Amino acid sequence: MDEPTASLNDNDSDRLLTLLLELKAQGVTSIIISHKLNEISRVADSITIIRDGSSVDYLNCREEDVSEDRIIKAMVGRDMEDRYPPRMPNIGEILFEVKDWRVDHPNHAAREIIKGISINARKGEIVGIAGLMGSGRTELAMSIFGKSYGKNIRGNVSIHGKSIDVSTVRKAIDNGLAYVTEDRKGYGLLLEESIKKNTSLANLSGISNKLVVNDYRETHTANEFRSKLRIRSADVEQHTGNLSGGNQQKVVISKWLFTAPDVLILDEPTRGVDVGAKYEIYTIIDQVVQEGKCIIMISSEMPELLGMCDRIYVMNEGKIVGEFLAKDANQEAIMRSIMKNGENENE
């Protein structure tokens, strides 16, 4: 199984892992490919670690105590004392605000998917959105970004206190929004095109003269982002389909950073990415907010939200059901917010 829990919430992941252990007791052998170390440690009897196409370590979990730190060291080729880069937040005034945002289902107009959500983010702030699968996080992000999801969308979006038009993706981009999709292969990249072409895709005017693409400018821009984001490739002519998951994700982020957004919305930014590349992506995220921009981060990995965000909203069933400052947040408190709202809905 290749990344079997990548799109599952914690409860469903737990059920799948329990099923694997039950199958093991029945004599069934399972091979799991995963970046989630806690899951591998829970179910694996042995672990083979692959880096750059080669097997670099073999761990027998039945004969030795295997720690996550040891796995990480083998994966990245060095010790990693911290999973997240040190941050010195410099949070300013409100930069981005959404008020009373409502979205109906695209095929069932009577069904409201997003129910009067109001959120904001300040300059230099990373704001997380936590929630279970199906809570409406991705639908919220897509509906804000050019109304690319849903029908009968209403509410107000503002940047720097001024209402902006997000009625199309082009208008959303022109007004300072960018959205990194949760599905980079399906919607984030042209896999048969080069790093260069993908980097410039959302901002062709930035590398064109009178509607004609300037190849030198396009190549120069792609090389700048390749160097800045440490994209590992032969050159910028390499097809993105031949890159690792982490490097593909960096290309997607490059594409949107080239549009110079004020607000960067990241939907599952490290899904299917190894530990070393995750750290590099976290560093990129921190660099973006250090420039005075803000980031909205949607993630199913609570440790990621707790490790990177300054503030966390909690969503459930299309509503905001909780809000925490980083210093007050933990996994238990977030889950309590979700479960409490679920109980209220059922009463």
Residue ranges and their predicted role:
Residues M1-E347:
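Glycine-rich phosphate-binding loops of nucleotide-dependent enzymes
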